[in-house]
Amino acid sequence: MRTPDAQMRAGHIPAHLIPDGTDPRTVVVVHHQAEARDWTGPILLALVAAGGSVGVVMTLCLLLQTAATTATALAAAAPAGVGLSISLKARKGK
């Protein structure tokens, strides 16, 4: 305990802080307590993160639904001749 602050935290009273003529046994050390923590920031951060996650999941679901609808429409239209077909005939001999 080299600093007065460390001595105060340990409950020791540095001699230079006691006024002359005071009985050290009657001195009371009052420790300062930290103020109550403000939880607004962490709670707001958690809500924004949860909302962002829900937004990402909803966007992915919408994208998947659009892709499935497009694939269904293409599969229904393929037998109607929308696709191109190429037939290759190989020549036998000269």
From Swiss-Prot:
One of its GO terms (cellular component) is plasma membrane. This is Protein SpdA. The keyword DNA repair does not apply. It comes from the Bacteria. The chain crosses the membrane at residues 41-68. Keywords: Cell membrane, Membrane, Plasmid, Transmembrane, Transmembrane helix. Involved in plasmid transfer. It is found in: Cell membrane. Its main location: membrane. It is a single-pass membrane protein. It comes from Streptomyces lividans. The keyword Metal-binding does not apply.
